[in-house]
Amino acid sequence: MLLFTILFLWCPIFGILAYAVFLGHQRKVSVKALVSLAVMLSLYLGCLGTTKELLGDFLTYKKMFEMVPDDGLWGYILSFGKEPVYYGYTYLAYYLYMGNWNLFVFSLTTLNYLLLSYCILKVGHYLRTSFINQIMALFFMAFFFQEFAAIGNMLRQGLAQSITLAFLVRWYIDRKHSWWIALCALGI
């Protein structure tokens, strides 16, 4: 794994493809290896998300992010009147990332893809699909044009969708009713 990590740091897409090819030639692939691939894909897409052009809703999200220092936590959250989880995270992230918009976008995009990957791997394991099919599903999700394009313009909605899917996967597959996850999705 160290070699693939180095390749990923040198050239992310090459590291991801090399690791996927390596996994594809194995007789058996562990869940840990599939999760590692999902993390690599999510980090790569998180980095790509920071390069998106500021248009439409994406520009509005940036303006809202830059408004954080104008108010206290509750004043900021209440000034929008909706999506308290998103604006609470925005407020905290502003200070956590020292006002760096790109780190904020990176965190949301990466989290979105990590959640989608979690869902794919959970469903794949539940259905007992081959690891090759799970790898293909991860790549399809990661490089599906409409999903990546929508993430920039509909950052909040994409994250809410991913959180909702994670809630449903936990509910139907793990039989765990994690209502706090559903409430997070509603608050985004």
Please place each PLM-identified region on the residue numbering.
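Transmembrane signal-anchor helices characteristic of membrane glycosylation enzymes that use polyprenol
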Residues: 1-55
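Transmembrane-helix signature of polytopic, membrane-embedded enzymes
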Residues: 32, 120-144
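Hydrophobic alpha-helical transmembrane segments of multi-pass membrane proteins
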Residues: 51, 103-111, 142, 151, ...
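Short hydrophobic/aromatic helix or loop-helix immediately within or flanking a transmembrane segment
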Residues: 59-67, 76-99
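Transmembrane-helix motifs of polytopic, lipid-linked glycan transferases
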Residues: 107-127
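Membrane-embedded helix bundles of polyisoprenyl
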Residues: 133-151, 158-165
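Membrane-interface transmembrane helices that cradle and orient dolichyl/undecaprenyl
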Residues: 164-179
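Membrane-interface alpha helices of multi-pass inner-membrane proteins
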Residues: 178-188
